[in-house]
Each structure stands twice: as C-alpha cells, then as structure tokens.
Amino acid sequence: MREPAVPAQIVLLFGLPRSGTTWLAKLFDSHPDVLYRHEPDIVHRGGHLPDWPALEPDAALLAEARRYLDLLLATRTLKTSGSRPVFSQKNYRSRLASHLRAALIHGVRALEQVGAGPLTRRLPIPDGIASADWARVTLVLKSVSSPTRLGLFARALPGCRVIFTIRHPCGQVASMRRGEQLGAFEEAFDHDWLLAGEEAQAHGLEPAMFQRLPILEQLAWQWVILNERAVADVARLPAARIVRHADLARAPRAGARELLAFAGLSLTPATETFIRESTEYDGEGRYYQVFRNAAAEIDKWRHELSAEEQARILAIARRSRLVALWPELTAPEHGCAFSPAPADGHAGEGAIGD
C-alpha cells in the first residue's frame, strides 16, 4: 500500500516526561480516525537540529526540520506504532488489515520479550491504509523529548494543531524523582543540554552551581526552563492549546470532548469507553501505565513530598511566570520573557479549566 508523506490532519502532542502526555495520546489513539505515532523522536533523535532553535527560525532550518518531521511521521517501529493498549479497529483500515496488524504487533512484542529486541526493534509495522483512505486520517505525534523544538516543528508543519500538557510543579517533580529512584529513565539528567538555552541564562543558572543543587531542585529548575520555552513557543502559534494535567484528570470526558473538537474530531463510543476504563482503574499501579485511578493520582504529590520539599519546589517555580497558570500560587517576584496565556480562545489558551 502506497502511503503519502502527510495525512489530512496532524496533531503535535508535546509535554515534559510525566506530564500526562501518554494518557492524552492514548485517548486520541482510541478514536477510530486517529493514527498514532508514539515518541518517534526517540527512535530518530535528530541530532543535526539545534536543541534550542531560535523562536523565529529561518527558512533553511524550517526546511531541515520538515525533512526530519517527514521521517518521524513515517516511522513505524514497534515503539512508535505498537504502544499499549493497541486500538485495532479504525475507520481507515479494513477489519482484516486490523486483525493482521494487531497479530504482528503482538508477535513482534513476544519476540522482543524473549531477547530478539535487536532484530525486531526496527521492523516496520504496516499502517494498513489504502491510498484513498488517507484523507480521513488524523495523525497524532507525541513527544516528551523535544519540548524546546515545539515551535520549530509546528512552523515546519503549517496547518498542524498543537497541544502542550503541563503539570503542577510539585506533581511533576515528585513523579520525576520517583522515576529516578526506580531507574525508569533510559538516559541520565543532562545538565549541559538544560542550561544551554536563553531561559536558563535569564535565571542566572551556571553549570557549576547547578550541579551542586540537590536533585529535587534540579528537577524543579528543569520544570521551569523547559516549560518556559514551550509556553513561549505556544504563544506564537496560531492553533495551539495548553492543558493543565489536573484539569484533564478531574474532568476527563469534558476535556476530551474539547480537545478532540480542537483537532476536528468528535467524542466516539470507543473513546468514551477508554476514558471510563482508564480513569476508574482500581488495580495495582506501575510507573509507566495508562490505566490509573485519576482522582487518586492528581494530588499524590501532597503525600510523597514533605512540606519542606514542597516549599523548596515552589520557591523555584515562583521565580517563573508559569505560576500564572495556577492562580492559587503566590504571584512570582521575577518574570520571564513571555506573556501569560490569553483567554480569548486563540494561541496559548488554557484549553481546560481555569
């Protein structure tokens, strides 16, 4: 089956690790018109592109970014096309093609579990879409590895929709620290990369000083620096939304309906089933897991972090205008170089909740 470089609609779903992107991505994936690519920028890192591109990239960089994005959109490995849970029934794919594709995914995953990972890691998983059916496809690409490239990527894909998720600083830091303790991350904390952008420099962060900070404070600064860049990018885009993790967790059905509509999609029975099953889960939790008790997860950090740890995190967060997204937090003493999200329904809007 011949596959075009670009489908009818593209949605870029970005956020920091542990910010709620996976649940939102699988929410979209449950929709029968969505084709989902899970973190293809981990398969192809794009090291030839700048980590901290200019907020207004030039034409040459946009062209190079577009070539890279075309590669990501076409990446169909087990990681990018077979993330769990697998939603097989799609409007753009025949029933037979759906069954064959699901069987292939389960078979490749079984081979990976018995040690054949190096052989199967790059094995392509077919999309199973006839050329005539691509016009009904909405392709959703999720990334937690490229928050500083969000603006570059969105500009390189004119007409795309952007959704950026952001989590309360204490919730983000608590979850990241838990992951560090569990050894859940493939890569070590990269101080040099984090401090290379203008955002870190604006806050006066220097490598020698930063490395002496406790991990809790390093993670808090990571929340500030990366989210500041992404929110600055969102403010410059014509079709972008910011979503607070807690708002979506507290009202998943309303939030899903609004975000799907933003992407030109409706709330379907399959998606409603996913919302119900994934938010009312009462079993044992794992670090990387879509099915959770949403109500219990929202404020989990209040029990994981001591009052003193919460105060240290918030002292750093309050140095950023990001706290404008949480009115209950004290107004910051020091600003950064972007305006709070407007409330007029345009770029940078807080799509759900306050």
Question: Where in the sequence are the language-model features?
Answer:
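A short acidic, amphipathic alpha-helical/loop segment
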Residues: W23, G151-A156
